């Protein structure tokens, strides 16, 4: 575990029990506008899918089955697991205005709308056609996705994290903090204040005495 991952655990957002997940990251400014404090939104029914059965990930090549872009293929750029949503890059878009003011109508920009997991299918790398998949184990014991039509393994893509690092391919450099150094306990709690610890470490002797203070 890297130091950035340890710091991310400390800044984890605590969500209320009736929180409704959306396209924005929980705790962000856009999310707070959708879920203002003190309000209760109607609960959304979501099909329960076990974590071990979920098979769509960021970077996957999928084909859309429904909607205006049915038959088109694209790359998954976002997965909202709590709503069974996936977002396909450049497809299933709608247009909206941003930066609207009194004197300016705003700039029209495209925005990808989410799709349910059953509205897309993974693309088989053998023939570039949509296919059903199932989880199987290889001879080495690795759990992989396999096309039910061709039997071809569909590997999981390596997707960078928010800080741009791909954990599977990252190699620590000379300026990176190792896991052992990050987890090493170097602080020993004491009853002295910080100032007293610094004075003791640097050999500073306090010879001054408090003078009388008069208030008028």
UniProtKB/Swiss-Prot annotation:
GO terms for biological process: translation. Residues 56-89 form the KOW domain. One of its GO terms (molecular function) is RNA binding. Disulfide bonds: none annotated. It is found in: Mitochondrion. InterPro entries: KOW (IPR005824), Rib_uL2_dom2 (IPR014722), Ribosomal_uL24 (IPR003256), Ribosomal_uL24_CS (IPR005825), Ribosomal_uL24_KOW (IPR041988), Translation_prot_SH3-like_sf (IPR008991). SMART domains: KOW (SM00739). The modification Phosphoserine is found at residue 24. The keyword Phosphoprotein applies. Residues 1-9 form a transit peptide. It comes from the Eukaryota. GO terms for cellular component: mitochondrial inner membrane; mitochondrial large ribosomal subunit; mitochondrion. Keywords: Mitochondrion, Phosphoprotein, Ribonucleoprotein, Ribosomal protein, Transit peptide. The keyword Oxidoreductase does not apply. Belongs to the universal ribosomal protein uL24 family. Component of the mitochondrial ribosome large subunit (39S) which comprises a 16S rRNA and about 50 distinct proteins. This is Large ribosomal subunit protein uL24m. It comes from Bos taurus. The lineage of its organism: Eukaryota, Metazoa, Chordata, Craniata, Vertebrata.
